[in-house]
Regions:
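Glycine-rich phosphate-binding loops that contact phosphosugars or nucleotide phosphates
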Residues: 48-197
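Extended, charge-enriched "interface" segments that sit outside catalytic cores
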Residues: 1-51
Length: 197
């Protein structure tokens, strides 16, 4: 086992680590510690309003904006979930993640979906992620060719005040939620990014 001297070394390292973490919290740079207390009222209302309406959900994002969601889907959805019909899925949509600019992947996703029966959620913390913008551009054009009112089929999760996606969101009138600016990508799954999906 470990003797007291060895434990003292680790205790000191733990104290130093905790001290650094508390300093980040005091400087409002570690927003992830506040995520359990976030207000989810608007998100829950939105999710309830959309429930049962769409056969497909396309999540557009990369890195921290998609990896947590993919992990949740793999952990919580049964194997072969997307192959099941709407009733077998409990009136929940199939989940597709557009997380890179591979044209074959985007094409395959869109070939599986119908524009009027698909909801799109675009996620980028900065609002200016190039891969996300490229994918959303393709998906937006696909929606625009298939339906009259695209804004009813798109929501965004992005920076509250800056970035290209924020400007587009405000101009087009998309439903929008804010990524907490002080929450890093690796923790975003615990924020609106993961909870809404």
């Amino acid at each position: 086992g470990l003797d007291d001297t060895a434990l003292d070394t680790y205790r000191e390292k733990a104290r130093m680590g905790l001290s650094r973490l508390l300093k980040l919290v005091d400087e409002d740079k570690a927003g992830f510690v506040n995520l359990p207390n976030q207000d989810t009222t608007a998100m829950k209302k939105f999710a309830k309003e959309q429930s049962g309406k769409f056969n497909d959900l396309i999540l557009v994002g990369i890195g921290g904006s998609s990896l947590g969601i993919e992990t949740l889907a793999a952990a919580l959805l049964p194997f072969g979930y997307n192959a099941r019909n709407f009733a077998q899925r409990g009136a929940f949509p199939r989940v597709w993640v557009a997380d890179n600019v591979d044209p074959a992947k985007i094409s395959d996703i869109l070939n599986e979906c119908e524009p009027g029966d698909t909801y799109v959620c675009v996620i980028t913390k900065s609002g200016s992620t190039v891969e996300t913008a490229a994918n959303f551009n393709v998906i937006y054009e696909w929606l625009d060719e298939g339906v009259k009112d695209v804004k009813k089929l798109v929501c965004t999760i992005t920076d509250p005040s800056s970035g290209a996606l924020r400007k587009i969101t405000d101009k087009e009138g998309f439903t929008s939620f804010e990524v907490p600016p002080n929450v890093g990508g690796r923790f975003s799954v615990l924020s609106i990014v993961g909870l809404l999906a």
